[in-house]
């Protein structure tokens, strides 16, 4: 490992959609043969040669491109309104993925707008409705059913991906998601953990601890739900060893997916004030690439990487500037793995290496 430390409707003219809402292989698939293809020394292998990506996983199971459409269903967050805390996480400005700042359009209209862009850009003609902004299980079950049903009523939507906090997934809501899974929709529960260290979670005002995440994963798995865990590299007070430990704790719970991205400083947050005062130093690009490549090597090949970096709108992003250059980051990850001669799962580490502070 690297030696790093750091302070519409379907596309026009598309053939008819078959098997609407069907996941053809809900059983666990074998991991892809990562890193096994021999490329010419002058060739540039795709990132999926090194990493088990969500896009490639869906392509293998559905036989065509499936793309997420982000949805803002006008939720709020219990860490903002007083139920769990006030002010939200120190790094959070949800305008970074809900930039309009106005009440969002209807779910159907958001999907229509998304499919027009995605279809033109990628050719995908089936979609997963990604409930993204704020806490997307923070409502009564009947309200959630109404919102999720609106998304699934679109003929080309094959499933749901629901982003939420680990302290906002009571049993009845997990049961609702399991109902959709039982109807053969693709269903992912995306849990925002960010760090497994309670000291860090308190420092960034998350409003929950690691125990809530642990319990949420166990309850989701009791119902056969797939879990994708969100993790941030570069949180205040953490170094490389914290990232390794958080990853291993997550993997020990048998999760199915991971989203990892760097901490970026956006306007309108307490982190932005700390950065301006010189109290927080963002990661350098080479540090992030080296660290996430270490994590990829430590991750078993069957785990699906839903995300390897994250961006924010240019008008909101303060630092680091490279967080606005998604493809530069992804290409850097690919090139680093190629240079190392490694790939996902090539350097598995046992959890007895954990630090416990």
Regions found by a protein language model. Give the residues of each.
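Auxiliary Fe-S-binding modules of radical SAM enzymes
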Residues: 26-56, 60-67, 257, 265-357
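Hydrophobic faces of well-ordered beta-strands that scaffold small-molecule active sites
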Residues: 67-71, 127-129, 160-162, 187-191, ...
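Distinct, well-ordered alpha-helical segments
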Residues: 141-149, 170-181
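N-terminal [4Fe-4S]-dependent radical SAM core
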Residues: 18-20, 27-128
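Core AdoMet radical
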Residues: 95-114, 121-141, 156-169, 185-212, ...
């Amino acid at each position: 490992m690297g030696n790093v430390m750091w302070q519409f409707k379907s596309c026009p003219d598309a053939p008819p959609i078959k098997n609407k809402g069907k996941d053809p292989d809900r059983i666990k698939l074998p991991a892809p043969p990562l890193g096994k293809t021999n490329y010419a020394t002058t060739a540039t292998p795709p990132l999926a040669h090194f990493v088990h990506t969500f896009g490639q996983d869906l392509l293998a199971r559905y036989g065509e491109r499936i793309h997420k459409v982000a949805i803002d269903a006008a939720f709020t967050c219990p860490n903002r309104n007083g139920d769990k805390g006030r002010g939200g996480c120190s790094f959070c400005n949800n305008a970074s993925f809900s930039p309009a700042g106005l009440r969002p359009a209807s779910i159907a209209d958001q999907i229509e707008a998304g499919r027009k862009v995605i279809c033109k850009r990628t050719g995908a003609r089936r979609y997963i409705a990604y409930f993204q902004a704020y806490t997307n299980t923070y409502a009564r079950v009947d309200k959630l059913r109404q919102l999720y049903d609106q998304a699934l009523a679109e003929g080309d939507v094959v499933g749901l991906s629901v982003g939420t906090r680990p302290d906002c997934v009571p049993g009845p809501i997990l049961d609702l998601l399991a109902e959709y899974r039982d109807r053969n929709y693709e269903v992912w529960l995306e849990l925002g953990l960010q760090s497994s260290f309670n000291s860090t979670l308190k420092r960034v005002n998350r409003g929950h601890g690691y125990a809530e995440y642990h319990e949420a994963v166990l309850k989701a798995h009791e119902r056969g739900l797939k879990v994708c865990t969100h993790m941030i590299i570069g949180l205040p007070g953490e170094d490389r060893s914290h990232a390794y430990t958080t990853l291993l704790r997550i993997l020990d719970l048998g999760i199915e997916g991971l989203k990892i991205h760097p901490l970026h400083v956006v306007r309108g947050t307490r982190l932005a004030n700390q950065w301006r005062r010189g109290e927080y130093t963002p990661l350098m690009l080479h540090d992030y690439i080296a660290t996430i490549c270490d994590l990829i090597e430590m991750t078993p090949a069957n785990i699906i990487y839903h995300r390897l970096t994250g961006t924010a709108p240019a008008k909101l992003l303060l630092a680091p500037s490279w967080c606005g250059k998604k493809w530069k980051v992804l290409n850097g990850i690919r090139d680093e793995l190629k240079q190392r001669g490694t790939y996902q799962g090539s350097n598995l580490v046992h959890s007895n290496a954990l630090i416990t502070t």
